[in-house]
Curated annotation (Swiss-Prot):
It comes from the Bacteria. Residues 169-183, 336-357 have a biased composition (Low complexity). Residues 57-82, 96-121, 160-184, 198-232, 247-277, 335-358, 449-579 are annotated as: Disordered. Residues 450-464 have a biased composition (Basic and acidic residues). It comes from Treponema pallidum (strain Nichols). This is Uncharacterized protein TP_0179. Signal peptide: none annotated.
Amino acid sequence: MTQALQVPSAPARCRHLRRKNGVLLRIVEKTDRTRYAHALRHGCRHRMCEGVHGTEEDAMGSESAEMDSPHATARPQEQGEDRAWDACGVWVKVPPEAQEPPVSSGGPEDPEAPAQHAPPGARVDAVRHHVYRALPVQSSAEDSRGFVDLSVEDEVLARGCSHAPGGESSSDQAADAPAGDAAYSEVPSFDDLVTRTAQSQDDRVDLSAAMSSVVTEEPPEPRGCSMPCPSGSCDTTEFDDLLSSLSHDAPEYPVDSDPITYSASEPSSEGPVRGAPFSDVDAVAQSLMGDAQVAAQGAQASTSGDASTDLLLKIAQEISSIRADLDQLKGTFSRQAGAEPAQAPATAPAPEGTEAAYSGFFCDDDPDETIALTNDELNNILITSEFTEEDGKDSAADAFGGELSGFESSHIGSAAGDFSYLEEDDHAAARVAQEQWVQQGRATLGNEVFDVKEQGAHADRDAAADPSPVAKDDASPEAQRAHVSSTGLDAAGAEQPLNTENVFDDEDTQREDTSFPLPEEQELDVSVPSLEFSAPHAIETAASESSEVATPVAIESPPQSEAARPAQGDSANLAPPLSKSLADEVRSVLGYMDRLLESLPEEKIEEFARSEYFHTYKHLFDELGIS
């Protein structure tokens, strides 16, 4: 910021008023930014240079002739003075009231005369002139209120303006400017000046606060006049009365009512104002604010301490409640652990001979009825069964697969008259039953065959001891063996082939150990029929197993001797008895088949009841004692 320029030394009758393009201009000092802006807007007189170089009335009286001429120009000897004034002030428009001719009755030494006889505008100017002459002139860059001088050369004149204060363009005014006045520059409008001033970052001053301080604060007491007063005295009491009486004539300006706030804890970033006078009031205010701040900090510390204490108490309460909950849970767990759970009653294992309850097709009889089978029936079951070596795991898988396939293939709700799928279901059930018989009867097969061989040996000895002529005529072992084989295979079908199976190999070995020698026997190939439960013969096979009427099987063998014929009556005793475990297994299989029959639709059950296989099926259940 440039230093404030002193008013140059010039004659007492210097030109501070001039006319430019028919507009009366006057110069305003650049000592106060707020006053400078106020002068640009309203053209009023604040700290005018006439307080040093003469009054406005003297200048207007001496140069009234030149001011009236629209094309008046400055005299050559006064152009240098104008440039000197341009260095320390700004030319502004003169308000209309300043253009009125001064009253000749009053002199500059009599301040009351203009107020009594002059027009209102001249009287106001005279009062303002006297008041501002009484104010001391500040030569430094800052006045008593801390306002910094405005450098017009740097902020206004160097920037230039697009419009003159009177509304003329800057280009027209530059053309009309005198050629010798090089320091002449147009004054920008107030709005442009305020905008540009607010954008500057050198010194920012709150205009509203400054205006408030200018309007509300009283002018300081005069410390002395740099120039003699017109009345010969610096007493301004009489002018205070005039100002109060003429306050209604002065224009009213908006004043920002926001007070200036000071912060004792946060100092201003710009630092203290240089040259600001020490104020006791400010010092007391700062001390009071410091005490208040210390007290506030203490209260805040106590409040924070109380808050922390409350927080600790709450945490302690929460911990105690959690501990109580844990104790309660521990007691609950201990009580539950102490109480022994109720033991389920142990179920005694069912005895081996206990019969399972059946809810089959024939459920009228007592389920505990014992099974009564003849030796011939059991022998027929064993002989007609096919014993094959199979993996137990595969058999079980096939058994379950057969069950599932049997259920999945049931055609519920199909058209009447189509019974082809019924036969497939029956065959699947029979196939499952056959596989179970094979697995369950394999364990007891060896013992039963051995018993059959022993019985056959005893029968042969009895036949040999019989003194009948038939035995004497033909008592060859081959005939006896053929007779036994034909008797044991009476239940087989006439057209079914028999598998070769040496059932009586061990019997020949035992016969050699008897007391009487026997000739060498020729082995006969005996084929045992294999029962493959195919679809069309499943029910026929079951019927053949329970049928007592047997068809003789044509076996290629040598002709039987007459000695072996009397032994046919005892061949029925050679059928091995059925073990209890095997009977249970057979009964369980037939019961399972009965339950499968119940799962069929009603139409299929009725169809089976009307068929020729129903009587055979019922007879088989009656013989086995299955209800």
